[in-house]
Amino acid sequence: MEQPSEFTLCLPGDPVPKGRPRVYNGHAMTPKRTVRAEERLFAEFRLKYPQAKPYQCPVRLEAEFWMSHRGRPDLDNLLKLVLDSLNGVAYVDDAQVVESHASKRMPDLWVYGAKGRYRKRKSGDPYTYCGHEYEPHLYIRIKPLPEWEPKERKQS
């Protein structure tokens, strides 16, 4: 099987941030929610790309986190979970990610009401972003970047 030119993955459900390890009796324990989310992302990647080998070159990672609520978690913690989960399957090491673009999409505060006017969003309303409905999910795209060497070095 030929190596894909890029990896894409869409995971339904609310994106999960990387939790801080807790220390008990001198041992660091990763929260169960974080472990389950990392295992799920790893498994979904393997399911979609069973024969793919990890990229060995620099890569660009794009991630869109479509949330079910506003506010927390922080974007960097969401991205950390993705980077750590795909270590060894999409790329050899997350140090290869030299370019990234991450965005956290949150539901609109105002929705179009039944009376034809905007009103504050209520808990039972569908999720909308800029007026367009969506379901919470995570979208990831990983693309290899060409390795570059100066001309002087190539000739010698």
Question: Residue ranges of each PLM-predicted region?
Answer:
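Acidic, proline/glycine-enriched N-terminal capping motif
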Residues: 1-156
